[in-house]
């Protein structure tokens, strides 16, 4: 796992326990996505843009999420995992909204979840 925080003194004004729950959920999903891939990688990057918005990106190089699944992943109880509850991403998105931020999925070569704090 690769972690990059720029600048090193980023401060997010939000409930630490709730945001930790979101990050842990996304990291667990990333670990499951890469499975036993020998070249599997997870990256966590935190940064601040020119508008002073803080972005936390959690990226993995597991299998691509198909469009028909991606459009449903934030819906409560939607899951493709055996034994999964389908509430993790929905709760994570609700936590981010209550914290004045957002949680989005970016699908390119790798799967990236972006937490944005305004």
Q: Where on the chain are the PLM-derived regions?
A:
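Conserved catalytic submotifs in the C-terminal HATPase_c
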Residues: 1-10, 49
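Short beta-strand/loop element within the Bergerat-fold HATPase_c
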Residues: 39-52
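Conserved glycine-rich
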Residues: 100-101
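Short alpha-helical Gxxx[C/S/T] motif in the catalytic ATP-binding
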Residues: 88, 92
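A residue-level detector for a conserved hydrophobic packing site
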Residues: 19-20
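Acidic ATP/Mg2+-coordinating residue in the GHKL
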Residues: 60
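Short conserved segment of the HATPase_c
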Residues: 65-76
């Amino acid at each position: 796992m690769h972690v990059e925080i720029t600048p090193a003194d980023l401060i997010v004004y939000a409930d630490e326990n709730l945001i930790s729950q979101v990050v842990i959920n996304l990291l667990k999903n990333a670990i499951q996505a890469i499975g036993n891939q020998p070249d599997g990688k997870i990256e966590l990057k935190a940064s601040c843009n020119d508008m002073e918005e803080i972005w936390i990106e959690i990226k993995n190089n597991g299998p691509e999420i198909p469009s028909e699944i991606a459009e449903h992943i934030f819906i409560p109880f939607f899951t493709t995992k055996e034994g999964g509850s389908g509430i993790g991403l929905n709760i994570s998105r609700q936590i981010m909204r209550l914290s004045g931020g957002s949680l989005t999925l970016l699908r390119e070569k790798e799967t990236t979840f972006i937490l944005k704090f305004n």
